[in-house]
């Protein structure tokens, strides 16, 4: 009797295993059918940019033409990111898939902040010191002086000097985040202990590359002040304490 129960139990377990295996095969075939179905072929790629630059969006769309019509499950996010991150104008990429066949590509663009002149050529740089453009004309950017450079290609850093790059990055980040009406037109780093920033004809004496947020905030507040109304001269924010203001 016990032996009969054992045999029946064994048959029941075997039947359950077969049923589970069959279900897994059927589910696998269903999944395979679904992911290969034409409905999952990418037919729409939406480009979202922080600057809404039309030319860059068109360029991105051209680069991603090859993924249209491909199965959305087989196109890896990392593949799309690797295609776009080679573009010096693109700082960051985020890819979102929306089933059945839509992709959203969010790009954060590198902005032109500085311009450096060499032998009549003007290099436009982003806030990290990377070359974004090279042209004969001068852009309406912050002119960077006091740096010796060799011929550079788009996408390369303007210099190999890490200390200079750090200064460019620090100032670039602050200038890029400046939302006030005060604009800067020149940064002179020929003397790293006595860095100079200009807003039109007003010299802002920065001193060394430290405590920059405080220094620039002080300078901007003075330039915006109706009580001071300085148009030409200098503002010395290089040391702690009250800035020194000299009008000419």
Q: Where do the PLM segments sit?
A:
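Cofactor-binding loop segments of dinucleotide-utilizing enzymes, especially the Rossmann-like FAD-
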Residues: 50
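Extended, alpha-helix-rich binding/interface surfaces that flank or overlap catalytic cores
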Residues: 47
């Amino acid at each position: 009797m016990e032996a009969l129960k054992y045999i029946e139990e064994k048959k029941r377990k075997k039947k359950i295993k077969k049923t589970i295996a069959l279900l897994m095969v059927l589910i696998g075939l269903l999944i395979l059918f679904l992911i290969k179905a034409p409905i999952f072929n990418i037919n729409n790629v939406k480009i979202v940019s922080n600057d809404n630059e039309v030319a860059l969006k068109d360029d991105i769309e051209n680069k991603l033409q090859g993924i249209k019509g491909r199965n959305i499950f087989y196109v890896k996010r990392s593949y799309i990111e690797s295609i776009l991150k080679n573009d010096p104008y693109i700082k960051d990429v985020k890819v979102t898939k929306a089933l059945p066949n839509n992709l959203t590509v969010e790009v954060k663009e590198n902005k032109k902040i500085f311009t450096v002149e060499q032998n009549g050529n003007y290099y436009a740089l982003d806030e990290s010191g990377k070359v974004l453009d090279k042209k004969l004309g001068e852009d309406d950017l912050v002119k960077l002086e006091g740096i010796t450079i060799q011929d550079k290609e788009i996408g390369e850093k303007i210099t190999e000097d890490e200390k200079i790059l750090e200064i460019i990055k620090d100032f670039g980040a602050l200038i890029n985040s400046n939302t006030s009406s005060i604009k800067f037109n020149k940064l002179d780093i020929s003397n790293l202990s006595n860095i100079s920033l200009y807003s039109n004809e007003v010299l802002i004496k920065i001193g060394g590359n430290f405590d920059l947020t405080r220094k620039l905030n002080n300078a901007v507040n003075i330039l915006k002040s109706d009580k001071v109304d300085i148009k030409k001269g200098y503002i010395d924010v290089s040391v702690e304490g009250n800035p020194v203001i000299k009008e000419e």
